[in-house]
Amino acid sequence: MGKQPVKLKAVVYALSPFQQKIMTGLWKDLPEKIHHKVSENWISATLLVTPVVGTYWYAQYFKEQEKLEHRF
């Protein structure tokens, strides 16, 4: 008394070559979406960017000081 396999119908999704509005939802209200993301995550972005910029600035400063040290 085993189970009998059931045939499932395949679902095929296709886009019409004549359809022009394929990804309109992606671009709809884009400035509002960007503003929302920035206003929600500005603390996280600051905490990510600050150490990276600080490290880069320190490396450039150290390199410049090392170059100037050999002048005298």
Swiss-Prot record:
Pfam families: Cyt_b-c1_8 (PF10890)
Topological relation to the membrane, as annotated: Single-pass membrane protein
UniProt key word tRNA processing: no
Transmembrane segments: 42-58
Ranges facing Mitochondrial matrix side: 1-41
Superkingdom of this protein's organism: Eukaryota
Keywords: Electron transport, Membrane, Mitochondrion, Mitochondrion inner membrane, Respiratory chain, Transmembrane, Transmembrane helix, Transport, Ubiquinone
Intracellular or extracellular location(s): Mitochondrion inner membrane
InterPro entries: Cyt_b-c1_8-plants, Cyt_bc1_su8_sf
CC annotations in GO: cytosol; mitochondrial inner membrane; mitochondrion; respiratory chain complex III
Biological-process GO terms, alphabetical: mitochondrial electron transport, ubiquinol to cytochrome c
Subunit text: Component of the ubiquinol-cytochrome c oxidoreductase (cytochrome b-c1 complex, complex III, CIII), a multisubunit enzyme composed of 10 subunits. The complex is composed of 3 respiratory subunits cytochrome b (MT-CYB), cytochrome c1 (CYC1-1 or CYC1-2) and Rieske protein (UCR1-1 or UCR1-2), 2 core protein subunits MPPalpha1 (or MPPalpha2) and MPPB, and 5 low-molecular weight protein subunits QCR7-1 (or QCR7-2), UCRQ-1 (or UCRQ-2), QCR9, UCRY and probably QCR6-1 (or QCR6-2).
Protein name, as recorded: Cytochrome b-c1 complex subunit 8-1, mitochondrial
